[in-house]
């Protein structure tokens, strides 16, 4: 049970500018067809945070905006409400809800995405008009999914509107995949050289390889990923950090720069020994960062946040669409967060006290 002080401390944990999208999923090779599945970068980020948030107060600290059009399915509203987050629905029945198609093509069964209806972006003014100035001032972490140029605009807007000028906003930035490449390196570096905010950049390994002009192919070994992670050292201001997401290889955290330099730590993927349980990677990266964001907001620990990011992503990729949630038992696909934490630590061999780690996330 959380006391009054804890409730105050956790009421503004994470907010995202990621969108809600209604997804259709087509995987003809396996005769898989799904309609009206909740999706989008914002949705999966919040889901990832929910998987880590075992308490109702923590879940209410997750803030996001869902834009509803005239065709918004009622069953999706019930699904979202069951998660217990601080979701705000904005209605505009003159338009259709943002909709997308996830489809797979080629011999490699490569996942593709396209919008089927116009998208509606979320910016800082939207956050303030929806949640109020006080919530933005108290926010522990801002999850951004956008290009480098838009990230700069959002950071400038945050600094402009924040009432408390003494505290640096913490930005957990997921660069837009198509614009994370060598052609856009200057924009991304401009964000990472900022010293008036704390930025934690998180591209995946394939995007990072393109960012440094190396290759469009995803690195396939941990050694390649570690070499890639080291390239971010001089790319960033000494106070900024990076989480390199490496798919089935897990993640590598690149810390702020200490007197002896940065630290580089590897965290295995949740299903690195149980790959047969991975059915669809859609939303895995977004949910990783949602789990990471809420954990970092609570603990300020890159290690704990990386563990939780991998756990959240592991739950998301176990099915097509979103995981099955039981709000009474607080299980995702039938498993509690505590049991997932125990499983992950036992499989990975990471030396952490489970009780202390769990307590740091549920205080």
Curated annotation (Swiss-Prot):
<protein>
    <recommendedName>
        <fullName>Protein MAK32</fullName>
    </recommendedName>
</protein>
<dbReference type="InterPro" id="IPR029056">
    <property type="entry name" value="Ribokinase-like"/>
</dbReference>
<comment type="function">
    <text>Necessary for the structural stability of L-A double-stranded RNA-containing particles. Necessary for growth at 37 degrees Celsius as well as for maintenance of the killer plasmid.</text>
</comment>
<dbReference type="InterPro" id="IPR011611">
    <property type="entry name" value="PfkB_dom"/>
</dbReference>
<dbReference type="InterPro" id="IPR034094">
    <property type="entry name" value="Mak32"/>
</dbReference>
<comment type="similarity">
    <text>To S.pombe SpAC4G8.14c.</text>
</comment>
<dbReference type="Pfam" id="PF00294">
    <property type="entry name" value="PfkB"/>
</dbReference>
């Amino acid at each position: 049970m959380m006391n009054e002080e804890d409730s105050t401390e956790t009421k503004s944990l994470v907010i995202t500018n990621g969108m809600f999208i209604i997804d259709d999923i087509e995987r003809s090779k396996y005769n898989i067809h799904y309609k009206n599945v909740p999706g989008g970068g914002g949705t999966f980020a919040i889901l990832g945070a929910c998987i880590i948030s075992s308490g109702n107060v923590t879940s209410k600290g997750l803030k996001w905006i869902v834009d509803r059009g005239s065709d918004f399915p009622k069953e999706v509203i019930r699904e979202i409400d069951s998660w217990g987050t601080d979701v705000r629905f904005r209605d505009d029945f003159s338009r259709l809800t943002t909709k997308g198609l996830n489809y797979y093509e080629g011999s490699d069964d490569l996942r593709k995405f396209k919008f089927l209806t116009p998208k509606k972006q979320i910016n800082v003014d939207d956050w303030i008009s929806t949640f109020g100035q006080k919530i933005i001032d108290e926010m522990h972490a801002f999850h951004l999914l956008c290009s480098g140029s838009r990230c700069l605009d959002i950071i400038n807007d945050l600094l402009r509107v924040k009432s408390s000028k003494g505290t640096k906003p913490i930005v957990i930035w997921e660069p837009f995949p198509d614009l994370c490449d060598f052609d856009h390196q200057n924009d991304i570096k401009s964000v990472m050289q900022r010293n008036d905010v704390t930025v934690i950049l998180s591209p995946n390994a394939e995007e990072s390889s393109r960012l440094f002009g190396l290759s469009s192919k995803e690195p396939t070994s941990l050694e390649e990923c570690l070499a890639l992670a080291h390239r971010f050292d001089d790319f960033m201001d000494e106070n900024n950090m990076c989480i390199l997401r490496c798919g089935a290889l897990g993640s590598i955290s690149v810390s702020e720069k200490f007197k002896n330099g940065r630290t580089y730590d590897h965290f295995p993927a949740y299903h690195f020994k149980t790959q047969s349980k991975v059915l669809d990677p859609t939303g895995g990266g977004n949910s990783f960062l949602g789990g990471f964001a809420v954990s970092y907001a609570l603990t300020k620990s890159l290690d704990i946040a990386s563990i939780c990011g991998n756990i959240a992503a592991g739950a998301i990729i176990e099915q097509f669409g979103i995981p099955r949630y039981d709000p009474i038992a607080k299980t995702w696909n039938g498993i509690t967060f505590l049991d997932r934490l125990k499983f992950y630590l036992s499989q990975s061999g990471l030396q952490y006290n489970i009780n202390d780690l769990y307590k740091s996330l549920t205080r």
